[in-house]
A protein has these predicted regions:
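Alpha/beta enzyme core
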Residues: 35, 84-114, 123-199, 215
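Hydrophobic faces of well-ordered beta-strands that scaffold small-molecule active sites
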Residues: 16-20, 41-43, 71-75, 98, ...
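Glycine- and other small-residue-rich loops at beta-strand/loop junctions that grip anionic moieties
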Residues: 19-22, 75, 117, 121, ...
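N-terminal small/glycine-rich loop or linker at the start of catalytic domains
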Residues: 3-17, 51-71, 104, 109-112, ...
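Active-site beta-loop-alpha junctions enriched in small/polar residues
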Residues: 21, 46-48, 76-78, 103-105, ...
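Glycine-rich, positively charged N-terminal anion/phosphate-binding segment
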Residues: 2-6, 21-96
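Alpha/beta catalytic cores of nucleotide-metabolism and tRNA/nucleoside-modifying enzymes
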Residues: 1-4, 8, 12, 16, ...
């Protein structure tokens, strides 16, 4: 597989992409994934409407660092005019690609006609992608799911509409809205989409190891591999995938010392960005992910929920180690 590839004019060093995940892919975590070799980073999804209202919490999600390029910013919404207007207003922000969320399954998003609810309305998808791609010079992409139960969604046709409307790439999560993250991802539909369009196709769903990434590429022909849940607490997955695709060798999993140092570094970055009170609390979920499956991890998770300072966390990790 060719490692270097492009979305529009934006070149990536490798095909391994950090998926956009609410509450996960903030600036500190993106930077850690970049250091470990991610080819493209994606922000948390950001509401176009909230941007237009200059919502403080939303604006705080739009923080970038020069070291993280290339990075894709994901917005969600359902009003073509508003989304195009917002896209134009934020184009000067230092991101490289603008992605439109058409796959979020969360009820509060879907009930507003946003996220995966857009799959029910191909005409609206066409209007949104057309207006947004005309409003900005940066490449525009879309992330979709393969269906919405109860509606005759044809994901191949949706992908063609996205391409015809001016998108530079499409990311496909091989599950329907109702599946959320249950069951197996349907890679065959990703393959059919890849065969039907000429823009790059990014495969997403069930990729949790270098061998799974290789299998996805082999079975679908996809150009990019997007990793979501498997990267939580595991930014090393990008290092492992790059090494495997270039050498055929599997790297050993990180040692406890590596994990501990990553937790502490991640914590320092969170504190620097958000202050100690918020930073420590933000790290609680990450610590659970970093230590999942390890001996005494339940006790460590419990105790980490009680710490309120960096020093306390450092002592806890030294003691548990």
């Amino acid at each position: 597989m060719e490692m270097k590839w492009k979305i529009g004019s934006v070149e990536m060093e490798n095909p391994f992409i950090l998926a956009p995940m609410a509450g996960v892919t903030d600036l500190p975590f993106r930077m850690l994934c970049k250091e470990q070799g991610a080819g493209l980073l994606c922000t948390e999804m950001v509401s176009a409407k909230a941007i237009s209202f200059h919502n403080k919490n939303t604006i705080s999600l739009m923080q970038f660092d020069p070291s993280e390029h290339p990075v894709s910013m994901q917005i969600f919404g359902s009003e073509p005019d508003l989304m195009a207007e917002v896209a134009k207003s934020i184009e000067e922000q230092p991101f490289d690609i603008l992605d439109i969320n058409m796959g979020c399954p969360v009820p509060k998003v879907v009930n507003n006609g946003e996220g995966s609810a857009l799959l029910k309305n191909p005409k609206l998808i066409r209007e949104i992608v057309t207006q947004v791609s005309h409003a900005v010079k940066k490449p525009v992409t879309a992330k979709i799911r393969i269906g919405f139960e109860g509606y005759p969604v044809d994901p191949v046709e949706i992908a063609k509409i996205i391409e015809d409307s001016g998108a530079a790439a499409v990311a496909v999560h091989g599950r329907t809205r109702q599946q959320y993250y249950a069951g197996e991802a349907d890679w065959d539909t990703i393959r059919r989409i890849k065969e039907a369009v000429s823009i790059p196709v990014i495969g997403n769903g069930d990729v949790d190891s270098p061998k799974k990434a290789e299998k996805l590429v082999r079975e679908t022909g996809c150009d990019g591999v997007m990793i979501g849940r498997a990267v939580r607490g595991n930014p090393w997955i990008f290092r492992e995938m790059n090494h495997y695709f270039t050498t055929g060798e599997l790297l050993p999993r990180p040692s406890w010392e590596e994990i501990k140092e990553m937790i502490l570094r991640h914590t320092r970055m969170q504190i620097e960005l958000k202050g100690e009170f918020t930073g420590i609390r933000e790290m609680r979920k990450h610590i659970a992910w970093y230590t999942a499956g390890m001996k005494h991890s339940a006790g460590l998770r419990r105790d980490s929920n009680l710490v309120s300072s960096y020093e306390e966390l450092e002592k806890l990790l030294d003691f548990r180690g």
